[in-house]
Amino acid sequence: MTATDTHQAIDAVWRIESPKLIAGLARIVRDIGVAEDLAHDALVAALEQWPESGVPNNPGAWLMATGKHRAIDYFRRNKRVEQKHVELGHELEAEQERAVPDLDAALDDDIGDDLLRLVFTACHPVLSTEARVALTLRMVGGLTTDEIARAFLVSEPTVAQRIVRAKKTLAKEQVPFEVPRGIDRAPRLASVLEVIYLIFNEGYTATAGDDWMRPALCEDALRLGRILAELAPAEPEVHGLVALMEIQASRSRARLGPAGEPVLLLDQNRAQWDRLLIRRGLVALERAERLGGAQGVYALQAAIAACHARARTADETDWKRIAALYVSLAALTPSPVVELNRAVAFGMAYGPQSGLDVVDTLVGEPTLRNYHLLPSVRGDLLKKLGRLGEARQEFERAAALTRNARERTLLLARATACGT
């Protein structure tokens, strides 16, 4: 293996193993910032040694053992709890006396719990939403600051600052590296799910920039969701979120035209929908429902997505079922955005005037003042009612509000189609 091949192998190993490595070391040092530094020390050691010695049979175990040695050095340098590095030294000696497969098993025993702790810590509500997203993608997703910056159209120094500040905040607030229990678990899990879905949504419909979608972010969010489903298999809302993302991701290819332009749901070629992702999503939804989570926020949205997925054509869509699901969702989590989606469903199920009646109750809603989808939906309903002049004005207003260039082009085209 050439030096170049070795470095490529190290890059691949790091991408896969870094979340597990950071999680395992964080359990030891109880500080994810320090854990990341120790993990990078182990990476540097690999870069120095593997080109000469070759990539180990179990590179993840090698990195973990090296990271633990660095943790001992860290405790010694900081003169913290002498017993800690003595215990860690004994642990390493015991591991080195075992065969490699036994070491693998020993590491795997704890790694699931460690990863779950890392997920909950990175998504702790003491952090801002932007910080939680950046830290989760960095620590759990294994992305570089450059990759995160490019995905969210911000500068790399901005992302780096968010991550540094997040780690400092966690240390300052003495956030424990643990999985929350009891009454704290539900709100903390909600924070984790919110972060993952925010990442997915930014990939599914980019809020700004020239691209309608950023598929890599959808893939990252799906990967995080699937990991979480394995780590917390008894949580129905985790499976509900995975179901929602799987089904929505199944439409990705059909959502873009030949030139990258947006293709709306009812205009999509359903033959391009990914049937494997749909099946996976439906299985996840069934799992959520079996666990008693049919009325969860994400499970309800997944059930709505499933209605679209099961319809062979747009005309076969069960809009009355979708409208009923939105009524349930609005009762569970009242919000103007949910009401706007309910308006769309009512417009399709019971006629455009029914939808417009709902939308018109939202026109003065302060939180939707700059939300481009409000005039977009209103324009669509007005167009169906034959009120083309008003529809054109709404589409033009929506185009002025959106920050996505592709969406702006689509909205202006819809305005033009209404005539003068």
State what each model feature region is.
Residues 241, 245-248, 301, 305, ...:
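"A position-specific structural signal for the A-helix of alpha-solenoid helical repeats
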Residues 68-86, 94:
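Arg/Lys-rich amphipathic alpha helix in sigma70-family domain 2
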Residues 13-32, 45-49, 120, 124, ...:
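Amphipathic, Lys/Arg- and hydrophobic-enriched alpha-helical face
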Residues 21, 25, 63, 67-75:
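Hydrophobic-face residues of short alpha-helical interaction/recognition segments
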Residues 2-23, 33-36, 186-194, 198:
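A short, charge-rich alpha-helical start-of-domain segment used by transcription regulators
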Residues 86-130, 136-147, 154-327:
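Amphipathic helix-loop-helix modules that constitute alpha-helical solenoid scaffolds
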Residues 37-44, 57-69:
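Structural recognition of an alpha-helix C-terminal capping motif at a helix-to-coil junction
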